[in-house]
From Swiss-Prot:
Transmembrane segments: none annotated. Keywords: ATP-binding, Cytoplasm, DNA synthesis, Kinase, Metal-binding, Nucleotide-binding, Transferase, Zinc. Its EC number is 2.7.1.21. This is Thymidine kinase. Its main location: cytoplasm. It is found in: Cytoplasm. It comes from Haemophilus influenzae (strain 86-028NP). Zn(2+) binds at C145, C147, C182, H185. It comes from the Bacteria. GO terms for cellular component: cytosol. SUPFAM superfamilies: Glucocorticoid receptor-like (DNA-binding domain), P-loop containing nucleoside triphosphate hydrolases. ATP binds at S9, T10, M11, N12, A13, G14, K15, S16, D87, E88, A89, Q90. The lineage of its organism: Bacteria, Pseudomonadati, Pseudomonadota, Gammaproteobacteria, Pasteurellales.
Amino acid sequence: MAKLYFYYSTMNAGKSTTLLQSSYNYRERDMSTLVYTAAIDDRFGVGKVTSRIGISQDAFLFRSETNLFDEINEHLKKEKVHCVLVDEAQFLSKQQVYQLSDVVDKLKIPVLCYGLRTDFQAELFEGSKYLLAWADQLEELKTICYCGRKANFVLRLNDQGEVIKEGAQIQIGGNDSYLSVCRLHYKEKCGQI
């Protein structure tokens, strides 16, 4: 039975690595996958899912106006799809999460989404909010704070390594711009305790 999955975490937990491994596992068994990533995230090149450990795969892009159900349904007319995998799923809209649930419910294709749960202000992203609400299965991928505790928050940093507390929710960046931390160190660095 097909399901909608959401694998979530803070940054540097291996979400893209896990997605790429899942896609490889399907393809190794002669099953086809459709891999998507957000057009907004071009850190490693447009149309690529790339892991920090150096592996990558070409991907279709989703933008705010992309109708994922229609696009996947069109692709099915050309070839069978055994699994859909979505990287940077926090950037999905509410409507796109609903479309992915239709891929599961109407097309009977499993959809595996990977993304951040919250932003640098500890607020849910739109895509994450609706995946947390509507996914059939949720799984947290864990990483650690510099103190060794589980990291479940992310700090945004400026060029001098100082914490930024305000700004646009979406700012594409990697290890130079963000730091995954535990709740205690998030509160400390944000001046909340």
